[in-house]
Curated annotation (Swiss-Prot):
Binding site for ATP: K523
Domain notes: ValRS has two distinct active sites: one for aminoacylation and one for editing. The misactivated threonine is translocated from the active site to the editing site. The C-terminal coiled-coil domain is crucial for aminoacylation activity.
Function of the molecule: Catalyzes the attachment of valine to tRNA(Val). As ValRS can inadvertently accommodate and process structurally similar amino acids such as threonine, to avoid such errors, it has a 'posttransfer' editing activity that hydrolyzes mischarged Thr-tRNA(Val) in a tRNA-dependent manner.
Lineage: Bacteria, Bacillati, Bacillota, Bacilli, Bacillales
Name of the protein this chain belongs to: Valine--tRNA ligase
Originating organism: Staphylococcus aureus (strain MRSA252)
Keywords (A to Z) from UniProt: Aminoacyl-tRNA synthetase, ATP-binding, Coiled coil, Cytoplasm, Ligase, Nucleotide-binding, Protein biosynthesis
GO molecular function: aminoacyl-tRNA deacylase activity; ATP binding; valine-tRNA ligase activity
Motif extent ('KMSKS' region): 520-524
One GO location term (cellular component): cytosol
Name of the coding gene: valS
């Protein structure tokens, strides 16, 4: 297969993915004797297109799956998408609002039709993006969290947990999103520090002079106050416990009660109790059997319990209420106060603690089982391990999970209420006399169905499902550390509860993709990067390799166009190295022609040794998910060892007349390049397939080729030391040429004073490499080389490298040239020093600019020191 002179990712990638899918390369093996390896994709939300975080996530999964397939596993990489209840509903509602329509105008059924249309549109976008990324997914098994099979699983789980008493319906304080008009779980609330105020009010005693001072950050909730509490041990209030105060504005009498919850040392030591609008107040209210007065509606507006403030937005009510209290001289003081305020993760609205009847999951026993499991052989391994502590901590402090949502898009709760008796029926099927029942209108939290993803996608609850029996538990979960609580923890406790096994063996957690300056990528900052744009510019292989190797497990990744471009340059280097190799291997060279038992040269032995070392390193690091280190190992071997050294060294036999040696070199080139392609394939699937198809190969695709294995018979330890000596000598000669301003094209005499006879013999046997890379007019290698008076000498491991200077350069002219260069460098150093010592510049210039100046100074100083040393050497 022809390779064009220049690497063009568009040409390389065009049609390749479609060919892989069409030929069924990503389907599991039909050989059931193979060990299985399963990854289920973390389902992206159908709210929109994939971002760089998704690209990173799925690239890592695809790398692991491709590698395991090559290692002989029966692999399944299962695709799917999440309905993303609140997020998708918000998108669809926003689209309708543009047309002046609300979901209530349409009604539930018509609205859901719109939501399904949205899902289909964005699902097709997502599949197209998966294809561009080259993900080896088995589309015949694609799942969606609202499809029939998963809906069946959701109903069974809900009903089973309800029957066990783990799911219950109750009235509690929940997090209410007044914009989305739905309940939220604790982890869907983002806490942000907000500049607010502490309002100190007078609550007058009902039957005596005086008042109790009460402080609050939410004055609007006082309209729902039902008591004042003080600590029974607080001497200040001993005489007033049991008395009453008048609730300002409202005029309602509130009892003064004793409760040890109150902190004597905080504020006045007295606090108001609003059971319907604060979780702690609710608990106090339960203990003292207080009335629950809800003063807001679901939109965050004051209701008819708020008196004259009815219909006002909660924050407008706050302002007006404070003004009214001022008029009645009931405001003691208002203090500025920065405090943590909960915001909806999805809508951004300030979350309201709100008394509501919802469905909950009782978490204590589920959490305990998850924690206990981590002490058994069935434990889940976290990468990095520190996240296991994060998981354990959360499980130890978990609260009951609010699972009902006041939405239409999602799994409708399988609970019905009898129209006459109010009886609750919970079941996988609707009641037979459905006309007498009304189904609960709420839907389940999106994460409820996502928590079942590893087993529901494989056919559960059908325990006889072939996929469930063969591919569960899954092997690895790859996801961001930001959803340990949302998703990872919930999959673990649901997996243990319903399958009695961990849902996955390993959890590999990565960080967030950040902008180059370290800030989070966001629409508001305008610093987001579309992965498809990157692919259009540099190709999928460049993006994949950057994402996979640019960070270590658990750490964030800074996106850098420059680094993606450097990967593109790396692929170009690979492409050019492959083209050279293929031209020398020849079209007639076949797999069976590869013979590594012949007369291997030093370069052959060395590159085969380094190849085997790299195979061992890459395999070991990949098993630990250390793909950043894998990237470095591959880069160093391919760029430095193979392309820069071996390919150049292979030109010696290939340009010679020894046909037997040429055939050996062809074998080594072919074998090494083939193994490089196999190691690179999981990272760069497109370009490796293209090059591999051009190489002598067996099989129809590199996708199904075997993973490289270490061959002990092709490890020649002694070659490494000899090659190290040669490379050091070559680098020394080239550096000396630069220092005396003599180009490589000019032949010069070179002397090598070997440290001992053994080294002399070794270097003499391999002098062809020194001649090729150093271009000497004469080359003298000996233990007793006489070093001329005027010479440039470098000490190396093998001895000394000597360049006689007599007749090579005009010493006086060279010293004069170097002194002028030194003066220029001194001038540049002075300029940079002046800039960096200028306080005005340092205080105003961006950090990037200052760092660039510091880098320049370091470069100039190194050059200055080098030139000065050369002058001193020449003068000596």
């Amino acid at each position: 297969m022809e390779m064009k002179p220049k690497y063009d990712p568009r040409e390389v990638e065009a049609g390749r993915y479609e060919e892989w899918v069409k030929n069924g390369y990503f389907k599991p093996s039909e050989d059931k004797s193979k060990e299985t390896y399963t990854i289920v994709i973390p389902p992206p939300n159908v709210t929109g297109k994939l971002h760089l975080g998704h690209a990173w996530d799925t690239t890592l999964q695809d790398i692991i799956t491709r590698m395991k397939r090559m290692q002989g596993y029966d692999t399944l990489y299962l695709p799917g998408m999440d309905h993303a209840g609140i997020a998708t509903q918000a998108k669809v509602e926003a689209k309708l609002n543009e047309q002046g329509i609300t979901r209530y105008d349409l009604g539930r059924e018509k609205f859901l039709e719109q939501a399904w249309d949205w899902k289909e549109e964005y699902a097709s976008f997502i599949r197209a993006q998966w294809a561009k990324l080259g993900l080896g997914l088995d589309y015949s098994r694609e799942r969606f969290t609202l499809d029939e099979g998963l809906s069946k699983a959701v109903k069974k789980v809900f009903v089973d947990l309800y029957n066990k008493g783990i799911i219950y319906r109750g009235e509690r304080i929940i997090n209410w999103d007044p914009k989305a008009r739905t309940a939220l779980s604790d982890i869907e609330v983002i806490h942000e520090d907000v500049q607010g105020a502490f309002y100190h009010f007078k609550y007058p005693y009902a039957d005596v002079e005086g008042f109790i001072e009460i402080a609050t950050t939410r004055p609007e909730t006082m309209l729902g106050d039902t008591a004042i509490v003080v600590n029974p041990n607080d001497e200040r209030y001993k005489d007033v416990i049991g008395k009453t105060v008048i609730l300002p504005i409202v005029g309602r009498e509130l009892p003064i009660l004793a409760d040890e919850y109150v902190d004597i040392d905080f504020g006045s030591g007295a606090m108001k109790v609003t059971p319907a609008h604060d979780p702690n107040d609710f608990e106090i209210g339960q203990r003292h059997q207080l009335e629950n007065i809800i003063v807001m509606d679901e939109n965050g507006k004051m209701n008819n319990k708020a008196g004259k403030y009815e219909g006002m937005d909660r924050f407008d009510c706050r302002k007006q209420l404070v003004e009214d209290l001022k008029e009645q001289d009931l405001v003691i003081k208002i203090e500025d106060h920065v405090h943590s305020v909960g915001h909806s993760e999805r809508s951004g609205a300030v979350v309201e603690p709100y008394l509501s009847t919802q469905w909950f999951v009782r978490m204590e026993d589920l959490a305990k089982r998850s924690l206990d499991n981590q002490k058994t052989d069935d434990r889940i391994d976290f990468y990095p391990q520190r996240f296991e502590h994060t998981f354990n901590q959360w499980m130890e402090n978990i609260r009951d999970w609010t699972i009902s949502r006041q939405l239409w898009w999602g799994h409708q709760i399988p609970a019905w209420y009898h129209k006459e008796t109010g009886e609750i029926y919970v079941g996988e099927e609707a009641p037979t006399d459905i006309e007498n029942w009304q189904q609960d209108e709420d839907v389940l939290d999106t994460w409820f169905s996502s928590a079942l993803w590893p087993f529901s996608t494989l056919g559960w609850p059908d325990l006889e499902s072939e996929d469930f029996k063969r591919y569960y538990p899954t092997n690895a979960l790859v996801t961001g550390y930001d959803i340990i609580f949302f998703w990872v923890a919930r999959m673990i406790f649901q997996g243990l509860e319903f399958t009695d096994r961990r849902p996955f063996n390993d959890v590999l957690l990565h960080g967030l993709v950040r902008a180059e300056d370290g800030r989070k990528m966001s629409k508001s900052l305008g610093n987001g990067v579309d992965p498809m744009d990157v692919i259009d510019e540099y190709g999928a292989d460049s993006l994949r390799y950057f994402l996979a190797t640019g960070s270590s497990p658990g750490h964030d990744l800074r996106y850098s166009t420059e680094k993606v471009e450097s990967v593109w340059n790396f692929i170009n280097k690979i492409w050019n190295g492959a083209r050279f190799s293929l031209m020398n291997i020849g079209e007639d060279f076949k797999v069976e022609d590869i013979d590594l038992s012949g007369n291997l040269s030093l370069a052959d032995k060395w590159i085969l040794t380094r190849l085997n070392e790299t195979i061992a390193t890459v395999t070991d690091l990949s098993d630990k998910y250390e793909f950043g280190e894998v990237g470095r190992a591959l880069y160093n071997f391919i760029w430095d060892d193979f392309c820069d050294w071996y390919i150049e060294m292979s030109k010696i036999p290939m340009n010679g007349n020894d046909e037997e040696q040429k055939q050996v070199t062809r074998s080594v080139l072919s074998y090494t390049l083939d193994n490089i392609m196999r190691m690179l394939h999981p990272f760069m699937p497109f370009v490796t397939e293209k090059i591999w198809q051009s190489l002598p190969h067996e099989g129809e695709t590199i996708v199904k080729a075997s993973w490289p294995e270490v061959r002990e018979s092709l490890i020649f330890e002694e070659s490494k030391q000899t090659m190290q000596q040669l490379v050091e000598i070559i680098k020394s000669v080239r550096q000396s040429r630069v220092e005396v301003n003599t180009p490589l094209s000019k032949e010069i005499p070179i002397l090598i004073q070997a440290k001992d006879k053994e080294i002399e013999t070794t270097l003499s046997q391999n002098k062809d490499y020194l001649i090729k890379f150093c271009n000497p007019s004469t080359l003298n290698i000996s233990t007793d080389v006489e070093i001329p008076e005027k010479a440039m000498t470098s000490v190396v491991i093998a001895g000394k490298v000597v360049l006689p200077l007599e007749g090579l350069i005009d010493m006086d002219k060279e010293i004069s040239r170097l002194e002028k260069e030194l003066a220029k460098l001194q001038s540049e150093l002075d300029r940079v020093d002046k800039k960096l010592s200028n306080e005005n510049f340092v205080s105003k210039a961006p950090e990037k600019v200052i760092n660039e100046e510091k880098r320049k100074k370091q470069d100039y100083q190194e050059k200055y020191d080098g030139v000065k040393a050369r002058i001193e050497q020449l003068k000596a």
